[in-house]
Amino acid sequence: MTFPILILAAPTGAGKTSLITELDPTRFEILSFDSRQIYREMPIGTAAPTKEQQSKIRHHLVEVLSPKESIDAGLYNRMAEEALQKVLNTDKIPVFTAGTGFYLKAFLFGMFPVPEISVSVRERVLSMSIEEKKVLLNDLDPEALDKIFSGDDYRLGRALEVNLMGEKWSRLKIDPNTSAIYKYNLEIRLGIFLDLDRKELYERINLRAKRMIDLGMADEAWEIRERYGESCPGLKSLGYNFALENKKGNSNVETFLVDLSQSHRNYAKRQITWFRKENYIQAMDRSEALERIKHIK
């Protein structure tokens, strides 16, 4: 027996959350693959679904970790597997929503058998800029650097961690036994990439950034800093560095808006690059996506 699943991927600001709330809650439940929205206490800067939106359809893996906790593909896999089992037991169809494509792909198709990373190595890599990571990775494993998209800070960091633990990241092979598709006999009935005109997407992102600032993202960031420290993993999420700089008085609100908008546009560009090369999803607009989902059995 196979279990049908849906995949809904989209760049930040594309309207994925609002589309989700239009789905039939008696037929579907959401498994979120988003490395930012998994954190609690940070709803403004992560644009997490509101309580009202979550009440319309069951969400899993949203606002479940403390900002002081680290997240990686291995932990995400374990949490996602627990959530998937719950959904399959309801006879509903799981909808995998993705902003973080790497986590989704690792869960569905399998993970690399990476060594356990020591605290000292993880802290060292976290303290490095993306350019510093590239330089060191080029020295240790140039083949790995060639395989990783230059703007993918997460994968650069993970590859560097593996190499610093004494193994070549470029020589690792995916273990198919860790694939959820294989383990749970899943069938991708429909894979959607929510496609927007680039100009429209950037306008939406700019408006979202302004709304985040108006709602108090700087205060939210400062409260997290006071509670868990400035180096806590949650504050590594997109845009919080600019929020803290604003709160410290090192930038005005105009600069904050420019920097926040630009960082979100750059992130969206990287997401689009990632998802466009994945063959298990196809680009379509919102209306077509909703119509196709309605007819899934």
Swiss-Prot record:
Catalytic reaction(s) noted: adenosine(37) in tRNA + dimethylallyl diphosphate = N(6)-dimethylallyladenosine(37) in tRNA + diphosphate
Description of how the protein assembles with itself and partners: Monomer.
Entry keyword annotation includes Nucleotide-binding: yes
Family membership noted in the UniProt record: Belongs to the IPP transferase family.
Keyword tags: ATP-binding, Magnesium, Nucleotide-binding, Transferase, tRNA processing
Stretches the record annotates as Interaction with substrate tRNA: 34-37
Top-rank EC class of the record's enzyme: transferase
Transmembrane residue ranges: none
Binding site for substrate: T12, G13, A14, G15, K16, T17
NCBIfam families to which the protein is assigned, alphabetical: miaA (TIGR00174)
PANTHER family, sorted: TRNA DIMETHYLALLYLTRANSFERASE (PTHR11088:SF60)
Gene Ontology molecular function: any one: ATP binding
Residues annotated as binding ATP: A10, P11, T12, G13, A14, G15, K16, T17
Function: Catalyzes the transfer of a dimethylallyl group onto the adenine at position 37 in tRNAs that read codons beginning with uridine, leading to the formation of N6-(dimethylallyl)adenosine (i(6)A).
E.C. designation(s): 2.5.1.75
One biological process term in Gene Ontology: tRNA modification
Cofactors that this protein relies on: Mg(2+)
Keyword Nucleotide-binding recorded: yes
Pfam families the UniProt entry points to: IPPT
Gene name of this polypeptide: miaA
Protein's recorded name: tRNA dimethylallyltransferase
UniProt-annotated site: Interaction with substrate tRNA, residues: T100
